[in-house]
């Protein structure tokens, strides 16, 4: 049977996805126990509402339209995200990331580890960990929602983003 790329299993019978998350946890924790690369490298942009976030779990927030006129990078590098990044670098848990903190407080790996362990995030680990907290970062994982005509019913979604909910 042919395996899909990413489904490889190591000698301990762990998937590559799980192994990458465990490695990510070790690396992230060298910066702080709240550091998450998704806050730097992921952008979920909802054009119908003007809202965005860097993960599926925290609440959406609005980018400053005036800041975007001066610098389109402000669409991702909002003041809100920069403050959350600063907290993470300092070892403070942003309250909006409570989904991950609950998982970790129960001894489990969280999406902080899984998302950060993916190649689109981990490849920039060294650059991000050594950059100033307020530096603008170009996201490598961009998801754009043009309208609510999506016909999927993802568990993390809602009626405002999917016509199937």
Q: Which residues make up each language-model segment?
A:
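Canonical Radical SAM [4Fe-4S] cluster-binding loop centered on the CxxxCxxC motif
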Residues: 53-62, 99, 104, 136-137, ...
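Alpha-helical context
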Residues: 12, 21-28, 126, 130-133
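Iron-sulfur (Fe-S) cluster-binding modules
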Residues: 2-5
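Recognition helices and adjacent regulatory flanks at domain boundaries
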Residues: 107-140, 150-152
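Short, surface-exposed linear patches
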Residues: 68, 122-123, 165
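A general structural-boundary detector
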Residues: 37, 84, 133, 141-144
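Accessory C-terminal segments flanking Radical SAM cores
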Residues: 15-119
């Amino acid at each position: 049977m042919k395996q899909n790329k990413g489904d490889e299993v190591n000698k301990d019978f762990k998937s590559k996805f799980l192994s990458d998350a465990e490695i990510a946890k070790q690396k992230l924790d060298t910066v702080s126990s709240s550091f998450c690369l998704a806050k730097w490298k992921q952008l979920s942009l909802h054009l119908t509402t003007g809202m965005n976030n860097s993960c599926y779990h925290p609440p959406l927030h609005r980018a400053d339209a005036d800041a975007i006129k001066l610098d389109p990078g402000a669409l991702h590098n909002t003041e809100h995200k920069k403050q959350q990044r600063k907290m993470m670098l300092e070892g403070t848990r942003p309250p909006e990331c409570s989904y991950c903190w609950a998982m970790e407080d129960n001894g489990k790996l969280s999406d902080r580890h899984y998302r950060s362990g993916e190649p689109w995030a981990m490849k920039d680990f060294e650059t991000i960990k050594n950059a100033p907290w307020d530096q603008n970062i170009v996201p490598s994982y961009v998801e754009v929602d043009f309208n609510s005509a999506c016909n999927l019913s993802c568990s993390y979604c809602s009626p405002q983003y999917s016509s199937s909910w």
